[in-house]
Amino acid sequence: MYAIVKTGGKQYKAEPGRLLKVEKLCANEGETVELPAICVRLDNGELKTEGKVKATVVKHDKHKKILVFKYKRKKNYKRLKGHRQPYTLIKVEEIV
C-alpha cells in the first residue's frame, strides 16, 4: 500500500514506515501532521482518488550548501553566494 502525497509544491511516494524529506513544515518535532493524498494504491491493486497520510515530524534541518556564482567577463565583477534550503524529515505512520 502506498500513497502519492502533495506538499510544498512537490509530490512524494509515501509508504508506512518510510522517512521523507519534504519542504519545511510549520510543526514542532514529535508532532503528528496530516497530509492530503492525491491517490492511494491499496494492497489488492484498487486505486482510490482521495485519502490522508498521517506522519510524525522527526526533525528540522538544512540541505547541503549550494553555491551561486555570478560573473561578468572583462569587468572584474564576481559574486559568490551560498544557500541552504530548510527541510523537514517526517516518518509516515499510516495511510487513511
Curated annotation (Swiss-Prot):
Pfam families: Ribosomal_L21p. InterPro entries: bL21-like (IPR028909), bL21-like_sf (IPR036164), Ribosomal_bL21 (IPR001787), Ribosomal_bL21_CS (IPR018258). The keyword Calcium does not apply. One of its GO terms (molecular function) is structural constituent of ribosome. GO terms for cellular component: cytoplasm; ribonucleoprotein complex; ribosome. One of its GO terms (biological process) is translation. It comes from the Bacteria. Keywords: Ribonucleoprotein, Ribosomal protein, RNA-binding, rRNA-binding. This protein binds to 23S rRNA in the presence of protein L20. Belongs to the bacterial ribosomal protein bL21 family. Part of the 50S ribosomal subunit. Contacts protein L20. PANTHER family: 50S RIBOSOMAL PROTEIN L21, LARGE RIBOSOMAL SUBUNIT PROTEIN BL21M. This is Large ribosomal subunit protein bL21. The gene is rplU.
